[in-house]
Amino acid sequence: MRLDILLFTLSSSTSLALSYSLPMDPAHSSVHTLSAADRHIGERVTRQRHLREEPANEARNYSDLAVEIKRLVEELDSRVLEQADISLLDRHYAGDYKAFRSDLMTYGYQTRFAEQYKLFKKLGIDFKHNY
């Protein structure tokens, strides 16, 4: 009986777990053995590892998503520009680079402006640089 009380006190003070969880019975004291695993510390270590690894994984996922979104936007832009009637754009702006740039900025195409301008230059559409 004293051994059981000693084991119980030891397990509660050092957070060691008893492998047998039924009420202590002096007739079955040999069944009560200490488990070497410290559950409390193990849970804390696991939680700390999870907190360290999670932000790195999320940052990696966000950077992968940013690359994928950029690729999809560029692909969509190229499809739209391939289908657009470039000559209509040229006649509408009549080579006025400032109006073209202003319209692009107004409608939120700032990130696409450089690529579209390069495409217009490649297609031979020249804008006056009067900005």
Curated annotation (Swiss-Prot):
Source organism, top-level taxon: Eukaryota
Signal sequence extent: 1-19
Induction: Highly expressed during infection.
Places the protein is found: Secreted; Host cell
Main localization category: secreted
Description of its domains: The RxLR-dEER motif is required for the delivery of the effector to the host cell cytoplasm but does not bind phosphatidylinositol monophosphates.
Family of this protein: Belongs to the RxLR effector family.
Protein name, UniProt field: RxLR effector protein 62
